Amino acid sequence: MKQKLNKLEKYWVMYDVGNSAFALLVSTIIPIYFKNMAAGNGISASDSTAYLSYAISISTLIVAILGPVLGTVADGKNRKKPLFTLFMLIGVLGCAALALPKSAILFLVVFVITKVGFSGSLIFYDSMLVDVTTDERMDDVSSQGYAWGYIGSCVPFVVSLALIFGADYIGISGTVATAGAFIINALWWAVVTIPLLKNYKQNYYMETKTNGVKETVKRLGTVCGEIRNDKKVFLFLVAFFFYIDGVYTIIEMATSYGKDVGISDTSLLLALLLTQIVAFPCAIVFGKLAQKFETARLIAVCIGAYFLVAVYALWLDAAWKFWVMATFVGVFQGAIQALSRSYFAKIIPKEKSSEYFGIFDIFGKGASFMGTMLMGISTQIFHTSKAGVIVIASMFVIGFVIFKIQSQTMQRGEKRSLAVSRTWDEFEAETENDYDDYDYGYENDYEIGDMDFAEERF
């Protein structure tokens, strides 16, 4: 039976619509704006590319370090929402502040702060999933978040492009127009987040006696130990690390790879928009399919599809082939991220969701860092970006194998639990029958009228 999103689920989805606007800026307008600014500051093209890469790596590293600690703190009663709000505001205000710097280095400082706010807010946002919906609806709701995020982010993006390309017609410079685009996206991000801030309530939490650093570190160590001993969670995180490594690397490096094989800037930009548009309905479809098929099976399909995309990229030498690849990426991009998020949320303790998603974020951020690094190293060693693509393809193979092992571990665990449950039910039934059948010898021991005992049984 189909069920529409309730109000709280819609408000949760809307934050994906808001933050995705900044994510799209990071992969499109910000690199172009920064490189133009850097050139004006006398920084070479190669150095500006390196500086931007360093800034992204630094922000990724900061969140990877803070994530588990913040997640541990957020699992206390009524702490998740304030922390989410703090990091969301850092991201929103930082996005607007990107319009201010005239120095390339200062711009990167603001960018790092903004990226930390953006990524940090997602730790708490992802963990909110257990509070806003049920296990049965997690796949669908998570998929709706990614889907509407993809299509919703196109609204401020298109407005921003119209402002930038129409700057001459309204009498402003391209720099001023781009600065205005940052403010537009910041406002969009803030406004669509308001309903979630007003209505979210943390239902699952841990009762903590103290708030000290020692207690926080101790709890973090406990969670890491629990994950290490829980095969289904540990194996999933390892598999996730490898296959999401390939996904993130394709997202972040597709434009650079496309330019390397001769695709024009216009084709690359339009292909990126196509990916966003295609990802919208496909993410929703996969969320619906998860109601009929096992989530693990759908994730495996997505991993396999991404492997084929990576192999296809080796023969990429024309714009139309890039468009085909962009279409297939759009089909599976939202699905694999959404289903991975909901799958993880269903196999972890709900009262520790922030702690676990803090660890989850480390694996995702680590994968993002490692994937781009390996692609860069292999490309330099073999003097072709296709060598990097082969590395990406191998990540999907490793991730797929480990994920299948994790799925089999889950199935064995479920079978054992079912067997134990059936054995206990049978034991209770037999015990109940024994009590019903046993003759304790009290019946007819005496006649109520004269109280004469018929016989002594004991």
Language-model segments: residues:
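Structural signature of the two symmetry-related core transmembrane helices
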Residues: P82-A96, R297-Y312
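Helix-loop junctions at membrane interfaces in 12-TM secondary transporters
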Residues: L98-F111, L314-A326
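Multi-pass alpha-helical transporter architecture, strongest
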Residues: W188-N199, I390-W424
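Glycine-rich segments within core transmembrane alpha-helices of 12-TM secondary carriers
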Residues: S142-I164, D361-G371
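Helix-loop boundary and gating motifs at the non-cytosolic
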Residues: Q3-T60, K232-A271
